[in-house]
Each structure stands twice: as structure tokens, then as C-alpha cells.
Amino acid sequence: MQTRQANTAYTLADVFRGMTLSEMQATAYDMSLPIPSKLRKAEYQEAIIHAIPEHIGDFLLRLARYELELLDQLVLIGSGKALIVPTLSINSALIANHIIQVEFLRNEHADCFTLSDELRPHIAQCLPAILNDPDRKPFDRLMQYAFGITNLYGALDYKKGMDMIVFRGMIDLDKPKARLLFKRFINSGFFLQCSQETIQNGKENQYFTSALMYELEPVLAETKARKKLVKRYNDFSDEEILAAGEFPYIRLMCDGYEELRKLLRAEFRMSDEQVRGTRYDSKSVGFIAI
């Protein structure tokens, strides 16, 4: 990872000044900010600017491990600097809710992340406790496993998602807590969209499309192709799924496809055949073994 000089003096007022009332309300909803809905635009802008620093700790609790690691790096490099990493191209809750700013460096094929000086001290105050909290380990592992599954399949219905993520022996959690954790990463910006579909017996089924699946969106648009992807669930080993889930974190730590191949072999005991079957391009996070 590299750093460079950047303008980190921008404020939340700068970020929200050009937004509509509905856009600010959407951000407040995503971050679970306690802001009254019946406010005028100027009043809402003032309220959200004060609410974000005050409730940033609650928001950070919902983030994936690699997002917290990215924030940690942005805090450590200090004021006036940006962090440059190989392009992630993800719909991170950090970006979607304007906690960090991102610029795509086309010539360097990298993303340039900046964190406002206004938010840095608030994040620095609560981030270490979250990163080092032993009680977060089940949640972090659940998130990692979920990233792996959605990288491989693209769409999950709620029941299958629960079965695949929690009740497969990966994590020993009681059902209510498992459902709570599942909802936490659904609401965290991890999923790009949620839609309800009516199946033949008249019951409604929820499908969640991963934010990491940009290159598979054309495939997911076709019902038959999506069913085929989900049907392939049993074709993948736990190691493959976990490796896919670990990929966003790996991209922050290393640069280059060959290094990634070595990591897959060493850390996840993937065979040469499995590694060769890994399809990767710079526009996506994660690999899709299709």
C-alpha cells in the first residue's frame, strides 16, 4: 500500500451540502441514526452532521473485518494523507455512507481512499476496542464465510442463506443470535439490493444480491442461470468458500495475482487445479470459480 498527500480537511457539511433530503434520509437509515424524519432539508443536514460523529461507534460494529482494517490504516497514516490500494471496486458501507471518500486512479489501476480530519478522532477513539474485541470473532468469521458464499453464488434466499452460513457447522451459534448477525450484515451495505419474489406455492422468498458481484450481474438477471449457480453449492469445499471470503482482506495486504495464488495454496491448501480455475479481474473483489 502507498500513501500520498490529499485534502483531508473536507467536512461532513461539504459532503452533504449537495445532497437531496431523500439522499440524506437514506444515509441516516442505513447508519441507523436517530434523526426525526419530519425535518426540513437544512435542519436534516445539520442533524446528520452532528449525529454521524456521535454514533460512529455503533456504525463501525456492523462493518466487515477488512473494512475496519482499511479504516485503521486511514487513521494511522494521519492527517493530510490518502491511502492507495489495488482497486477494490466494492459497494462498501464506508463508501456508500460517505464515511470515506474514494477516487479511482485509472492510470495506476488503484483506489485512493481519504478520511476526513473531522471524523478521524472519533473513529480512532472507538476503533481499537472493536478490532480487539474477542466477542467479535464469531461475527467476523460469519462475515468472512458470507463473503465467500456470495462470491461463489451471487444470490441467496434467506433460508438457504441461514443454512449455508450458520447451520453447516462453521459457527456454533444459537438460532436467534445467528439471525441477528445475519441481519446485521444485510443492513451493513454488504448486499447491493434485496428483492422479494413470489414462488409457485404462493409464498414470498427474499433474495439478496451481493455488492461484490458486479461482473455476474448479467448472469444473475437470468433466473435459470441463477438457479444453476445456487445449485452448485455442494460442488465447493469449505476451503474454497473461506478463501473467497478472505479475498477482500488479501487485496489490502498484497499486490499481484501471483502473490494471491501463493496465498491460496499456502493458507487454504488449494490445489494447483483449484487455483488455475480461479477467475480474477481487476474490476471485481473476490474470485468466482465457475
What are these regions (language model features)?
Residues 7, 15, 19, 39, ...:
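Alpha-helix boundary/N-cap detector
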Residues 200-286:
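Long, charge-rich, low-complexity intrinsically disordered regions
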Residues 28-29, 160-169:
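DNA-recognition alpha helix
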Residues 57-59, 115-152, 211-241:
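Short, amphipathic alpha-helical interaction segments positioned at domain boundaries
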Residues 1-123:
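Basic helix-extension-helix modules of the SAP/HeH family
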Residues 89-99, 169-198, 285-289:
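Charge-enriched amphipathic alpha-helical scaffolds
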Residues 66-73, 77, 141, 145-160:
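The feature captures two recurrent sequence modes
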Residues 14, 61, 77-84, 132, ...:
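Short, charged/polar micro-motifs that form catalytic or ligand-binding hotspots
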